[in-house]
Amino acid sequence: MKHVLLTLTLFVSFFASAQIVNIPDTNFKNALLNHNPVIDTNGDGEIQVSEATEVYDLNLYDKNIADLTGIEAFINISWLDCRKNLLIELDVSQNINLTYLDVSFNLLTSLDVTNNPQLTRLNCAKNQLTTLDTSQNINLEVFYCYANLLTSLDVSQNTLLNWFFCYENQLTSLDVSQNINLELLYAFTNQLTDIDLGSNINLEEIIIAQNQFTSLDISQNPNLTYLDFSTNNLSSIDISNNPGLLSIRGFNNQLSNIDVSNKPVLQQLLVNGNDLTSIDVSQNPELVILNCGENPIASLDVSQNIGLKGIEFSNTLVSEIDLSNNPLLCGVVGNN
């Protein structure tokens, strides 16, 4: 009888331990034990598999976690935030219900999200990724992958994409022709030489600064409100089909002319460091900031810009300027 009881006790003990999730990282375990809402519902200082399966949202932000072994037990989570940790690798292949995943500000050199088809929002920015496959993430709407080491990126299967932030990588080409729902595209500080935006009619903001563009066609993007093509090699740009532009940042290019005549709501125009000999802002009554320094401009008329608050025209040929009709001016930088 004693032998039977001992065997039964050992079996129960083994079964109980088998139901405890293996979590080798102390900081990860502490984060789970102190999580709000409570995960350790029986208060035994361990995380049982049954407790893990009851979790749907998991916040692990800034917990000094280096290893997320054990995350595979949380099979029902749809929301995982593990930003700002010390993760070198991460396996989310068992977390197939994820719709939100934020692994930004870690040390990841690889990330496999091919088994997470429900993802609508993915943030893997500020890591050390060299490749990333999002072909299976067909529901992706918001995608942050900036500040990595990516040399190529295929988003052709992410047709629902609205926001795409791929700046500060090493991309030499970028195809967004299948992303017809795209509204925000931030692709600055890469090595891009051209981009086809003909299919992106819903585009509202585009930043392609600090690339190697010599031309840019935005004629099919009538909803643009924010345009930044600064620090490229453009000698001209046609913005006649973009009447709703609020901000144009085109400094440090080779522009010899820019026509902003049909921009009634334009508030910011930064075109310093170009080859402009003149600039007409008489039809921009909402203009607040004008930077046109470092251009061979000889004269400047801002009499129609009564809301102007800041103007910079240093290193130009402007010898005098009438600012009597600009009562809100609080910043003026001109020639010495």
Residue ranges of model-derived segments:
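N-terminal capping/linker segments that flank leucine-rich repeat
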Residues: 4-81, 96, 117, 136-138, ...
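Conserved hydrophobic beta-strand positions in leucine-rich repeat
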Residues: 56-60, 80-82, 99-103, 120-124, ...
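Canonical leucine-rich repeat
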Residues: 68-71, 90, 111, 132, ...
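Right-handed parallel beta-helix
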Residues: 82-106, 115, 123-125
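Intrinsically disordered, low-complexity repeat tracts
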Residues: 93-94, 99, 110, 120, ...
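Leucine-rich solenoid repeat scaffolds
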Residues: 318-336
